[in-house]
């Protein structure tokens, strides 16, 4: 009875959240997984006269992985993720290093670097659609127009309609611009959290600035770097609005699974759209679950 009085009020307090999360998160995940094993609302199966709720097992997944378009979208996603993660980590660390050294008007620089985060992905995509205008002729705008005015016309290119590789890579440019400030804030907080005694001890031992950062400071930032990697990784998997704003859903060079899911939903092929969603969920799980296990073990060891 005493134990109930101890944890009972707390359970009562969090029970609404548990119920809402259980229904709107895990319940809908289960519902989507169930739909992905049927031919629900697929025009092709309905035209064939079969039940739209007929169970077909992993048929939708087999169809997706047998589709060249879906395989291409997975390759595009891989290119996007690599460019996005590497770019955001590089510029985030670079800006954190510059601010960590102590510069005048540091608050102004922090605000400038963090400002892109205050802009929605779609609004950012609209602006970058103009900057990355693919027209290289008289109607060129944005960067292509700037190159022409600066006498650097040889740098003009078609950006996101150029090739299967560079098309999706160019989409990562605005995404890197938008998230680098956030990564900078993480690394800067990590630098500021390192005790000054460690720096002084390393300098007394004769360590140069390069050795100080390489052997003392950077190892202290490894947990933050891992967290940043996981955050950027899962954000790259669900990137959608900025792609739609820049290139739309019909550009084969910038198609990713999220865009494929949107297209299938518009075609009322809800079963295959749900299958794409579950595939993305598995990818996210492959990123997040090992990180949670690693973090939990570290907490137990400490």
Where are these regions (language model features)?
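Short, Lys/Arg-rich, polar N-terminal cytosolic tail immediately upstream
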Residues: 1-5
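A structural signal for multi-pass alpha-helical bundles of membrane permease subunits
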Residues: 6-302
């Amino acid at each position: 009875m005493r134990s109930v009085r101890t944890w009972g009020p707390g359970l009562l307090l969090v029970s609404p959240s548990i119920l809402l999360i259980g229904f709107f998160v895990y319940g809908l995940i289960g519902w989507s997984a169930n739909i992905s094993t049927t031919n629900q609302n697929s025009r092709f199966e309905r035209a064939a006269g079969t039940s739209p709720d007929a169970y077909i097992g992993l048929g939708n997944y087999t169809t997706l992985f047998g589709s060249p378009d879906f395989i291409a979208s997975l390759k595009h996603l891989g290119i996007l993720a690599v460019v996005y993660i590497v770019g955001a980590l590089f510029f985030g660390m670079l800006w954190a290093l510059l601010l960590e050294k102590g510069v005048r008007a540091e608050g102004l620089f922090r605000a400038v670097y963090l400002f892109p985060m205050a802009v929605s992905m779609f609004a950012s995509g609209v602006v970058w659609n103009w900057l990355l205008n693919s027209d290289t002729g008289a109607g060129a705008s944005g960067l292509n127009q700037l190159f022409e005015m600066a006498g650097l016309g040889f740098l003009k290119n078609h950006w996101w309609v150029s090739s299967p590789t560079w098309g999706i890579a160019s989409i990562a440019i605005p995404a890197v611009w938008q998230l680098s400030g956030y990564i900078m804030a993480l690394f800067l907080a990590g630098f500021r959290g390192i005790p000054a005694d460690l720096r002084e001890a390393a300098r007394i031992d004769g360590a140069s600035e390069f050795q100080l950062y390489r052997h003392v400071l950077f190892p202290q930032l490894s947990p933050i770097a891992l967290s940043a990697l996981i955050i950027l990784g899962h954000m790259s998997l669900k990137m959608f609005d900025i792609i739609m704003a820049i290139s739309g859903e019909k550009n084969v060079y910038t198609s990713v699974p999220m865009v494929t899911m949107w297209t299938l939903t518009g075609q009322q092929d809800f079963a295959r759209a749900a299958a794409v969603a579950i595939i993305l969920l598995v990818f996210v799980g492959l990123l997040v679950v090992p990180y949670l296990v690693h973090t939990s073990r570290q907490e137990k060891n400490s």
